[in-house]
Structure formats: structure tokens, C-alpha cells
Regions:
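The DNA-recognition helices of helix-turn-helix-type DNA-binding domains
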Residues: 70-71
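DNA major-groove recognition helix of helix-turn-helix/homeodomain DNA-binding modules
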Residues: 74-92
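Short alpha-helical DNA-recognition segment
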Residues: 45-64
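Short, charged recognition helix plus adjacent turn
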Residues: 3-4, 43-46, 90-98
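Generic structural marker for isolated residues within well-ordered, non-membrane alpha-helices
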Residues: 40, 49, 78
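Long, contiguous binding/interaction regions
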Residues: 57, 76, 97-98
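DNA major-groove recognition helix of helix-turn-helix
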Residues: 67
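N-terminal flexible/basic segments that precede or flank functional cores
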Residues: 1-39
Length: 98
């Protein structure tokens, strides 16, 4: 029986938009920029960094830097990346907020 590397399996699962959305939302809920950037990088890898760079007109090397744990993309770049992934940012009221 063939075994699948965890990272390879994750990249396959992240090709599902529903799974990718849940994955990114969980990373956001962690409250850590590093965790979110790692998750966004995983989702981007599932689509292909080169493909996203081509669609967004962002330099591939810059994409890797932006999507690193210490990456700090500006809002415009983040929007372009998410748009290329078929996703968008949304602001919602917290359930327990007054």
C-alpha cells in the first residue's frame, strides 16, 4: 500500500476551495501572522506559486518572500493573491461582541 507524505496530502486537500477556506480561517483564528502566512503559503503552493505570480503580475521571488513566515505583504498584494485563489477578505462581527 502506497503512503502519501503529509505535505503532499495537504496540498491535494487544499485544492478544494472549501477546505482552503476552512484552513485559512483556522489560521486567522490562531491570531498569529506567522501561522496565517504559513497557511496562505500552503494554499498558494496547492495552486502553484508560479501560476499565481503570473496571474497577479507579482514577481515569483517576491511571492515567496511575501508568503514566508515573516512575510508582510501589503493589503493590495494580499488582495491580488487571494483573488487569484478565488478568495476574498471579509470582515464579520464576532459572535460574542456587544
Amino acid at each position: 500500500m502506497a503512503t502519501v507524505n503529509y505535505n503532499d496530502g495537504l496540498l491535494v486537500r487544499l485544492q478544494s476551495p472549501e477546505y482552503a477556506i476552512e484552513y485559512l480561517n483556522e489560521a486567522l483564528n490562531e491570531g498569529s501572522q506567522e501561522v496565517f502566512m504559513m497557511a496562505l503559503r500552503d494554499v498558494a503552493k496547492a495552486k502553484g506559486i508560479s501560476q499565481i505570480a503570473k496571474e497577479t503580475n507579482l514577481n515569483r521571488e517576491s511571492m515567496y518572500r511575501m508568503l514566508s513566515e515573516k512575510g508582510n505583504p501589503n493589503l493590495s498584494s494580499l488582495h491580488q493573491i487571494l483573488n487569484s485563489l478565488g478568495l476574498t477578505l471579509a470582515i464579520e462581527k464576532k459572535e460574542n461582541a456587544a
